[in-house]
Amino acid sequence: MKKLLVSALAATVLSFGIGSGVTIASAAEPQAVTKSNILTMAAVWKQTAAEYRALYYQGFNIAQKYVDEAVAKKKKKDKPLAVITDMDDTVVIHDRYWAHLIANGEEFFNDPVWDKYIPTNSLLPAPGALEFLNHCKEKGVEVFYVTSRDQGEGTYEMALGNLQSLGFPYADKEHLTVLVDTSNKEPRQKEIAEKYNVIVKLGDSLNDFQRKYYIKKDFEERNLMTAMDKDLFGTKYIIMPNPTDGHWIAAIFGQSEPEDTEENRALWQKTATRNAW
């Protein structure tokens, strides 16, 4: 996950620690509003916009259509059916984490806070996710979760606990893969594809589909590559909305979690104004 700018708007958002039994930091008085509010706007959009939710519903509806078609066409001799999905911002969302950062004056992604947030199970199911995943189970389609995280010792158990806390199907060691040392999901996805007929892949980052999209400091090349593969989106790849973080940031900064520096702020500004009239 990545970075965020400060806004007094988030003072109305409840701290994600409520009911978790874990205190991360008190949501102090909201910080002064700054002129730069691009990422704050993205966080507000994620927390309030019906359009944000509609995009999730749309994605899961499309995926379910392909699941139903695959089930109807499957023959006994065929490989079993499966869906491969990312976790974060695909089937689970972290609005409370972003709200916490803003309420505490954070302007960029904060790893220590993220690592404290994860074990609280304060995440939420993405709109439509639970219904879709349960539909897969009802149809006999297995779901494999492939995610990349690193909270140190206990990383895997935390991720598994996140899924189980939300009542997700297939939340077990057979179906969950947590990559700690790499974000390259292709090797694991290929292993799954050897035994299963993978209907669709779901993710919020292009890197969730193929490693070739993980391009640093060249968002134009990444956009071009996406255009070349346009027929895969909505058919084999189901992309979910995420304006606050993802590998698209690495295409600008060279890393997915750039530090809060004057140089990086200047690059944000330069990139945001590149098409100004």
Predicted regions, residues:
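Non-catalytic pre-domain segments flanking phosphatase-related domains
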Residues: 4-9, 13-85, 253-277
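C-terminal cap/substrate-recognition subdomain and adjoining C-terminal extension
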Residues: 29-33, 150-277
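Second-shell loop/turn segments in exported
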Residues: 45-56, 115-123, 144-151, 177-179
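Sec-exported extracytoplasmic/periplasmic mature domains
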Residues: 68, 72, 97, 134-142, ...
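Surface-exposed patches in mature extracellular/periplasmic domains of secreted proteins
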Residues: 71-82, 143-148, 171-176
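Active-site neighborhood of HAD-like aspartate-dependent phosphohydrolases
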Residues: 73-80, 91-124
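Acidic helix-start/capping segments at beta-turn-to-alpha-helix junctions
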Residues: 79-91, 153-154, 181
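Substrate-recognition element of Asp-dependent hydrolases with the DxDx(T/V) motif
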Residues: 89, 129-163
